């Protein structure tokens, strides 16, 4: 009688731990159910930080193998050499406005809705009929001319550098800046069309000739065109948002149009121009934070402040001259409630405050 067959034993390879599996390493937050690959600015990370920080990494953060993309005949990724400014940590900058995809659509949608309601109500109430001819001519020539400045800066200044900075946080802020400019230019264009349809005396095409040949606007036009020729993205941002916008943009929008419109029977224009001023306030907010970070950098702060002073010496005299070139338009409204000198003084005061905030020396010529 044969012996019963022995049960067959299965053999398994021995388990060998390689420390490549999940949960292999112990570190301070290894047992936490939440994980951040960056340090939030506050106790909890915001949605802005979650969708923005390190979306555009670099070899100093996470890309240990170096840039994984680039042009065949150029440097890879986003070279820091695209600006003369230097930073110990470009990723330190976080947009104080916390702009990301959702906020762009939400904020711009709200502004477009506001402008649309304003224009609809103006036509329904025949608000333009109460305007005097001098004010109608002022809007026809000057607000239309400023539309070209906004469009040019949005399309050829900010759009051109919205992927030049070394971090996604800076590029997002610049991209939103471009969207602000283009949307405001569009609002002014729609306003121009509405006035052309509502008032026979309003020439909706006059702004072209004014922008191209009116003596008072040629210095401003030259400034916008010169800005487009700057190759350094940080210099372009500095000269646009810190110098030009303060001495020319805000001077025209805030210190003239917003001040005299109501006295000339116009309550529509301040609503539209006010959206542009609100946009610029947000754009100035991120610009101030960025240049403040660079000016106070522990390693490169001194060199950056010298660089900013050099940019200031190159652009301030021209911007000041261009601001004074606009002086004739202060005499065009029928009700001249503000003078050019008082408007310029207010603009200079705000400009000095911005320079102080980013640790840039105030030019001696500012007080002359």
From Swiss-Prot:
SUPFAM superfamilies: Ferritin-like. Residues 1-33 are annotated as: Disordered. It holds the Pfam family Phenol_Hydrox. This is Propane 2-monooxygenase, hydroxylase component small subunit. Its EC number is 1.14.13.227. GO terms for molecular function: oxidoreductase activity, acting on paired donors, with incorporation or reduction of molecular oxygen, NAD(P)H as one donor, and incorporation of one atom of oxygen. The propane 2-monooxygenase multicomponent enzyme system is composed of an electron transfer component and a monooxygenase component interacting with the effector protein PrmD. The electron transfer component is composed of a reductase (PrmB), and the monooxygenase component is formed by a large subunit (PrmA) and a small subunit (PrmC). Probably requires the presence of the chaperonin-like protein PrmG to ensure a productive folding, resulting of a soluble PrmC, which leads to the active form of PrmABCD. Belongs to the TmoE/XamoE family. Component of the propane 2-monooxygenase multicomponent enzyme system which is involved in the degradation of propane via the O2-dependent hydroxylation of propane. Under acetone induction, also able to catalyze the oxidation of phenol to yield hydroquinone. It comes from the Bacteria. Keywords: Monooxygenase, NAD, Oxidoreductase. Induction: By propane and acetone. It catalyses: propane + NADH + O2 + H(+) = propan-2-ol + NAD(+) + H2O; phenol + NADH + O2 + H(+) = hydroquinone + NAD(+) + H2O. It is an enzyme of class 1 (oxidoreductase).
